[in-house]
Amino acid sequence: MVQIGPLAIRWYGVLLTLAIFLGYELARRRLRAWGWDLEPFERVVFWAVVFGVVGARLGYVLTSPGYFLENPLEALYIWHGGLSFHGAILGGGLTFYYFHRRRGYPLWPYLDAATPGVALGIVAGRIGNLMNGSDTAGRLTTLPIGFTWPEWARGFPGVCPGIDDISEVYRCAELLRGPVHLTQVYGAVVGLILLFLSLYWLRKRPFYGYAFWQFVLWYSVLRSVLEEPFRLNPLWLPVYRNDELGIGLFTATQVVSLPLVLLSLYMLRRLGKGEASRR
C-alpha cells in the first residue's frame, strides 16, 4: 500500500484496474478479428465492470451474513477488502444479458471475448491479496509447502489491533503463528491456468458461448480443488477437516461451485446442439 496524505493506494486496486484495461483491449481485438462491431461492446463494458464489482461485493457479503447484519455499513466499504469472483462473473454476465435483451447486443460473443480479461482479473486480484498480506489467508499446515510470514511483513499484524469480531481475531492469531498455505499464490496459479485455457478455447470455439461456459466450469473446479480446501474460511458443510495438513471441506465457494458446474455442462450441451442443428 502507498499512502499519499489521506489517500491510500492499495496494490489490489491498482492491479485489478490494470487487468480490466488489458482485458478490455484483448476483448476488443478478439471481437474485431471475428468481425463484430465494437461500438455496442464499448457501450456495455463499462456497466459490466460496474455491476461486476457490485456483484463481487454482494457475493462476499452473502457469505458472511452475521458480520454484515451487525455492521451493515461495512458492506459499502469495498476498500476494506472482500470480493467474490463468482459474484463478479454473475454481475457482469447479467449486465451483458440485460443489454442483449433490451438492445439486441450480441451476448455469447461478448462473454467469450471477455474470458481472458476475467482470468487476468483473478491473477491480479490474488497478487494484490498477497501484497496486502491479510487477504485470502491460508490454513496452518505441517506440509513442506507451508509458508511462515517474516516479522517484517506487517500486513497481518496491521489488521489485528482493535478487532472485535472473534473470527477475525482467530484468523490473525493463526496467521502470525504460521506456517500456512500460501493460498494467494494458489489462486494466482488458478488464474494463470484459466488464462491459457481461455486463449485455447477462443481459438477452438466450435460455437459462441463455448469459451464462457468452459471458463465457468473450470474456474469452479480448479478453485474448489486447488485453492478453497486450503483457505482459512468457515466450512459451510463440515464434511472433512485436517488441521495438521491444513485442509477443510466444504466452504461456501465449494458449495456454490457444484450447481455452477452442472449449469455449465448443461449450457455447453445445449449451445452445442443448437450449433449442430444449424449446420
UniProtKB/Swiss-Prot annotation:
Instruction: Identify the metabolic or biological route this protein is part of.
Output: Protein modification; lipoprotein biosynthesis (diacylglyceryl transfer)
**What's in the keyword line of the UniProt record?**
Cell inner membrane, Cell membrane, Membrane, Transferase, Transmembrane, Transmembrane helix
| Entry-linked InterPro entries | Lgt
Q: Which top-level group of life is the source organism from?
A: Bacteria
Uppermost EC category = transferase
> Which Pfam families would you find in this protein's record?
LGT
Q: Where do the TM regions start and end?
A: 4-24, 44-64, 76-96, 104-124, 182-202, 206-226, 245-265
GO MF annotations in UniProt: phosphatidylglycerol-prolipoprotein diacylglyceryl transferase activity
Localization: Cell inner membrane
GO process terms (BP): lipoprotein biosynthetic process
Topology relative to the membrane: Multi-pass membrane protein
- For this protein, the Enzyme Commission number is 2.5.1.145
Q: Specify which residues bind a 1,2-diacyl-sn-glycero-3-phospho-(1'-sn-glycerol) according to the UniProt entry for this protein.
A: R126
User: Gene Ontology terms, cellular component aspect?
Assistant: plasma membrane
PANTHER family, A to Z: PHOSPHATIDYLGLYCEROL--PROLIPOPROTEIN DIACYLGLYCERYL TRANSFERASE, PROLIPOPROTEIN DIACYLGLYCERYL TRANSFERASE
**What is the annotated role of this protein in its UniProt record?**
Catalyzes the transfer of the diacylglyceryl group from phosphatidylglycerol to the sulfhydryl group of the N-terminal cysteine of a prolipoprotein, the first step in the formation of mature lipoproteins.
Q: Which family does it belong to?
A: Belongs to the Lgt family.
Protein name, as recorded: Phosphatidylglycerol--prolipoprotein diacylglyceryl transferase
